Amino acid sequence: MDYLSSMGSQTARFCLILLFLFYYLPCALSQDDLWGCGTPFRCGNITAGFPFLGGIRGEVCGHHSLKLNCNKHSNTTSLIFSGHNYTVLYIDNNNNSVTLGLSRQDFSGPFCSASFSSTLLSSGLFQNLPSYKSLTVFYACDPRRHFLGNFTCPVKGLGSIIQNSTYGILCDGSFSVPVPTSFVSEEEVLDLTHLESVLRKGFEVKLNIDEIPCPLECFSSRANCLFLAGSCCKYHDRTTTCGGDTGDLLREIIPNTRSILITIGQVVGFHVFIIVVMIIAFLFWRRKKVNDLRKQNLEALVTSRRYSYRQIKKITKSFTEVVGRGGFGTVYKGNLRDGRKVAVKILKDSNGNCEDFINEVASISQTSHVNIVSLLGFCFEKSKRAIVYEFLENGSLDQSSNLDVSTLYGIALGVARGIEYLHFGCKKRIVHFDIKPQNVLLDENLKPKVADFGLAKLCEKQESILSLLDTRGTIGYIAPELFSRVYGNVSHKSDVYSYGMLVLEMTGARNKERVQNADSNNSSAYFPDWIFKDLENGDYVKLLADGLTREEEDIAKKMILVGLWCIQFRPSDRPSMNKVVGMMEGNLDSLDPPPKPLLHMPMQNNNAESSQPSEEDSSIYSEV
């Protein structure tokens, strides 16, 4: 329910953002653009109204190809057309026509540095004046030939401005520019210096607009002219008359209430459709992401042997020998056909999702380490789910007693190496989230193996923060950040805390009479306080059995120091597991005393699980 509520809240916020972006914002901008049409563009000596754009004149105020730009530093106006920047020298509105003086900006400098491309203006929008003519400039010509009116550019090579049709064959490139007809003379040899001067002066063109008074009539009737295709349309009593059959069309819109409502209805309908499509696409994306993750985990199952439920019953002799019980299910002892002993965990029947089962099988399938329990197979038939592990004769750590300090140290070091492998040695990082004595199994040589990955989470190694929707683990071993994010973010450092509590229990739980509260049942939650006090007073030896050698005392103190380092409340203060292994393998003298924890955990039974209902472990072999 938390997930669905969170997802619904995210979807609602997503819809509101889309509604603002696709409806309210465009509507506001379109209204501003519409009423900005009454203000002419002004820059330096240039004043221009319809059909030009620029300044506060929006896209609806004129033709999209006639957008003017103002350089406020030089007070000059420019126009971009067909890939060229033009300086607008003047705009002349006389005799119901618009004449522009234009100069290509790349011709303002040396001719050889200009763009050797033709000046092309749309014949539908612009009309060439008879006083100007097109001049062809040839370049990249054959240097072995002689050309009249030639010039040489460093990059473009030999060129000519003589209008000779045969030059087009002898030269690799050419382009055309407008020049006054008086400049072009086929008889005389043209000079490049003269051409540069003429090009800087620019040329004139006329707009193909039939009528100019249209904007004044539009504004007097509180309407606006829009540029479409044809000529100028006038509004008289909400009717439209168009002048001329050629050129571009100007349409007026009178902002009456009915037209505004129709426009709003069209805009809302269109954008609601877009929003619905995007929401559906978003939900499909989320579903695909979840399915891809589940598929990725299921693919890991293929590498392990799959047993039928009938085979599982045969392996366990119809579930006759129970070796452990727990919140997730019951563990039975069994034998494979080759004689190997196995532990078979039968998960409780569930018709819901199988995430816990997939987590455990997928996690263990990706591991291969001497300190990680080996997965031998699984069963997945509808609601029947089972996991087959190697069987370890000595059961779990919590059932083992009378272990000497050296053996305890070897177990603690092995567990540290196993967790380090989960965090750094696998293709994907595995965070266990339930490190405790019941989940540390011992083989015939008392070598430890980390087991029970039902609460594990797989993530990429670069992920430093994990997202969890529930608190998982066992009270007394759960890191503070799993209870409240005020302590920090959940990460692989949560396993470090659990490991520290495990090590402290291995050392401090040996003198249970030290705990003053008889009802506390020696909860591991109280270890840090009184162990730290004994450590400060130099009485750490009292935590262990009598008759220890000096070497065993040093080992015990090192384990205590490492444990206290691991249970720091802030995750950033805890060492990573690879550093923990180094501390355990290193010398006691190289370890600095850790800071004293400022808080202590609530008093609880250390076998209670917060993520799942727990049951009392009733055998020598805990649930794996």
Swiss-Prot record:
Keywords: ATP-binding, Glycoprotein, Kinase, Membrane, Nucleotide-binding, Receptor, Serine/threonine-protein kinase, Signal, Transferase, Transmembrane, Transmembrane helix. The chain crosses the membrane at residues 264-284. GO terms for molecular function: ATP binding; polysaccharide binding; protein serine kinase activity; protein serine/threonine kinase activity. It catalyses: L-seryl-[protein] + ATP = O-phospho-L-seryl-[protein] + ADP + H(+); L-threonyl-[protein] + ATP = O-phospho-L-threonyl-[protein] + ADP + H(+). SUPFAM superfamilies: Protein kinase-like (PK-like) (SSF56112). Disulfide bonds: none annotated. One of its GO terms (cellular component) is membrane. Belongs to the protein kinase superfamily. Ser/Thr protein kinase family. This is LEAF RUST 10 DISEASE-RESISTANCE LOCUS RECEPTOR-LIKE PROTEIN KINASE-like 2.2.
